[in-house]
Amino acid sequence: MPYSNLHPSIPRPRSYRFKLAAFVLLVGSLMSLWMTGEPPSHTLHYLALHVASQQLGLLLKKLCCLAEELCHVQSRYQGSYWKAVRACVGSPICFMALILLSFYFYCSLENTSDLRLAWHLGILVLSKSLSMTLDLQSLAPAEVSAVCEEKNFNVAHGLAWSYYIGYLKLILPGLQARIRMFNQLHNNMLSGAGSRRLYILFPLDCGVPDDLSVADPNIRFRDMLPQQNTDRAGVKNRAYSNSVYELLENGQPAGACILEYATPLQTLFAMSQDGKAGFSREDRLEQAKLFCRTLEEILADVPESRNHCRLIVYQESEEGNSFSLSQEVLRHIRQEEKEEVTMSGPPTSVAPRPSLLSQEPRLLISGMEQPLPLRTDLI
């Protein structure tokens, strides 16, 4: 089952298969070394040399990086040379401890080869400098993507949080009150269970026209919700408005809802069209999917916002020529109504209390020996 329920093409977060594959490779290499029949001391000697060489190679790379960062101490590190060193080298304690431990095992074990340590270090410096000069160890695109997702460096992450904090968080809490005001003026147009939410469209190709009737003529503008005004970033009474659309099916009105596109998708599309942004169509598609996933995760942690909006993610190129945006929106509205009925449950009928006329007749027998006359004045 896909991680996101919005669209099957939205990727899941990366798991730990990378480390699992490395562990399997570790076990396989240990078994192959054991099958060679070499003495353990000989294997440990070369393992220590190789680990020390790797760590020294990383240290050389970090020192070259430090040479560049020292020229930007004032602008990037607030004049702190220690911050620049930490940014390039990371944690020097663990790093140096591993190098010293590797050299200890290398020097304490018997050297079975005729090659001296100085020769090994010379070859190490030569190979590492050649690799950095020719950029032979650059990260693969998948590695860059994994780092950006893990550290939240993606464009989509910032856009999703900006869209939530700067827009959805402001309008969703008061949406139901504005809908009630609208219904009083427009004969309960948004009275259905599926019409009391904000429906946000997410075309993954980021094609966002300014007029919804251009995307589908069966989507017809009806009116505007009452505006919401709030002071925001120095702007007094900044107005936030939403549009109400009527959906047609077979030429007849089939529903009405509050409908709009996710405006950050326009930003992604504009970036892919501007060469200075360095944003390809593949980057745009990836960031659009991550934008949807991040926004879904944000709303999942905020129930008061999640229950007032619904995300509609679609990709027209994959759906084919038969795709209809109005039908997709109607499908979500009807699904919302079904979920509302399921959550509320079937109506419970309360059995009425039996009246006196519906009771069985009972014979009342007096405990007196003689019957009384009907006239009370004779008593």
Swiss-Prot record:
It is a multi-pass membrane protein. Residues 153-340 are annotated as: Cyclic dinucleotide-binding domain (CBD). A motif (pLxIS motif) lies at residues 363-366. Its main location: endoplasmic reticulum. GO terms for cellular component: autophagosome; autophagosome membrane; ciliary basal body; cytoplasm; cytosol; endoplasmic reticulum; endoplasmic reticulum membrane; endoplasmic reticulum-Golgi intermediate compartment membrane. Residues 340-379 are annotated as: C-terminal tail (CTT). One of its GO terms (biological process) is regulation of gene expression. Belongs to the STING family. 2',3'-cUAMP binds at residues 167, 238, 263. CDD domains: STING_C_metazoan-like. Residues 35-44, 107-116 are lumenal. It is found in: Endoplasmic reticulum membrane; Cytoplasm, Perinuclear region; Endoplasmic reticulum-Golgi intermediate compartment membrane; Golgi apparatus membrane. The keyword Mitochondrion applies. A lipid is attached at residue 88 (S-palmitoyl cysteine). It catalyses: H(+)(in) = H(+)(out). Gene3D superfamilies: 1.20.5.5200, Stimulator of interferon genes protein. Homodimer; forms a homodimer in absence of cyclic nucleotide (c-di-GMP or cGAMP); 'Lys-63'-linked ubiquitination at Lys-151 is required for homodimerization. Homotetramer; in presence of cyclic nucleotide (c-di-GMP or cGAMP), forms tetramers and higher-order oligomers through side-by-side packing. Interacts (when phosphorylated) with IRF3; following activation and phosphorylation on the pLxIS motif by TBK1, recruits IRF3. Interacts with RIGI, MAVS and SSR2. Interacts with RNF5 and TRIM56. Interacts with TBK1; when homodimer, leading to subsequent production of IFN-beta. This is Stimulator of interferon genes protein. It comes from the Eukaryota.
